[in-house]
Swiss-Prot record:
Free-text function comment from the UniProt entry: Bifunctional serine/threonine kinase and phosphorylase involved in the regulation of the pyruvate, phosphate dikinase (PPDK) by catalyzing its phosphorylation/dephosphorylation.
Enzyme Commission number(s) of this protein: 2.7.11.32, 2.7.4.27
Enzyme's top EC category: transferase
Source domain of life: Bacteria
Family matches, as Pfam families: Kinase-PPPase
Name of the molecule in the record: Putative pyruvate, phosphate dikinase regulatory protein
Record-annotated disulphide pairs: none
Gene Ontology terms, MF aspect: ADP binding; ATP binding; phosphotransferase activity, phosphate group as acceptor; protein serine/threonine kinase activity
Residues reported in the UniProt entry to bind ADP: G147, L148, S149, R150, T151, S152, K153, T154
Family (UniProt): Belongs to the pyruvate, phosphate/water dikinase regulatory protein family. PDRP subfamily.
Length: 268
């Protein structure tokens, strides 16, 4: 049986994906074995010991460190084992075009992984505290959105989460009020979403029309109710002293850009 060794001086995800993609092209059984953190000449010897135990073997490598990569290639050639250096050709071509030398930093990919996991964490945070009565997340949030129903709080939270920003949204309703905790956090991370009353009425009526048995004349979309809510929201935002953003004719991306600039996202 053929074995493909996915060898890397980092976690080995890239090498493993390449090996799995190659193996999937054959009906015959191909075993893929990931070997991460090959960072020294001694580690290379361990790889070769594993290779020697295989009936038939190919090595797919994403090792960046030059001396380790060359040592692996040399040892494999001595055993007549094929080595595919996945990143080498791409790095060489890019180096020529950019007219600069690569850093050969094995941890560079890990930095990208950290950004990815930060994004996932922010998304989980946004979902956990979406329109929630659990306000424990306020102190851990990067951004706190407050606004009436149908002012795009949830999609805005998710958009920010995709940037790795932990956002929580607090719905404003006259009957409920706001949690005391919101007055205890830094007001610079609180953003009040405002909207034109006619536009809000239109959005709410359209929302209700999606539910065939619910008339759009109910209080939720009524003029008096909307004006009452807007007045309540305005008083709360003034009391907090937070930045307000009119979302009437503004795309979610544009609103997010304003927030990201205010919290210094591009400077992090």
């Amino acid at each position: 049986m053929l074995t493909i060794l996915a060898v890397s001086d980092s976690i080995g995800e890239t090498a493993n994906q390449v090996a799995v993609a190659a193996a999937s092209q054959f009906t015959e059984k191909v075993d893929v074995k990931r070997i991460p953190y090959v960072k020294s000449l001694e580690d290379v010897e361990d790889v070769m010991n594993i290779a020697n135990e295989c009936e038939s073997v190919i090595i797919v490598s994403t090792i960046i460190t030059v001396n380790v990569r060359e040592h692996l290639t040399q040892k494999a050639m001595e055993k007549n084992i094929s080595v595919m250096n996945v990143l080498g050709p791409i790095i060489n071509v890019a180096s020529t075009i950019l007219n600069t030398h690569p850093t050969y930093n094995p941890g560079a990919m890990r930095q990208t992984d950290e950004v990815y996991f930060k994004r996932i964490e922010a998304m989980e945070f946004a979902m956990q505290y979406d329109d929630s009565k659990d306000y424990r997340g306020l102190k851990n949030a990067d951004v706190v959105l407050i606004g009436l129903s149908r002012t795009s709080k949830t999609p805005l939270c998710m958009y920010l989460a995709n940037k790795g920003v932990k956002a929580i949204n607090i719905p404003l309703m006259p009957e409920v009020g706001v949690p005391d905790e919101i007055y205890e956090i830094d007001r610079k991370k609180v953003f009040g979403l405002t909207i034109n009353p006619l536009r809000l009425i239109e959005i709410r009526k359209r929302r209700l029309d999606k539910f065939h048995r619910i008339t759009s004349d109910i209080e939720y979309a009524g003029d008096a109710r909307v004006l009452e809510e807007l007045d309540f929201a305005d008083k709360i935002m003034r009391k907090i002293g937070c930045k307000t953003i009119d979302v009437t004719e503004r795309a979610i991306e544009d609103t997010a850009l304003i927030i990201l600039e205010k919290i210094g996202y591009n400077n992090k």
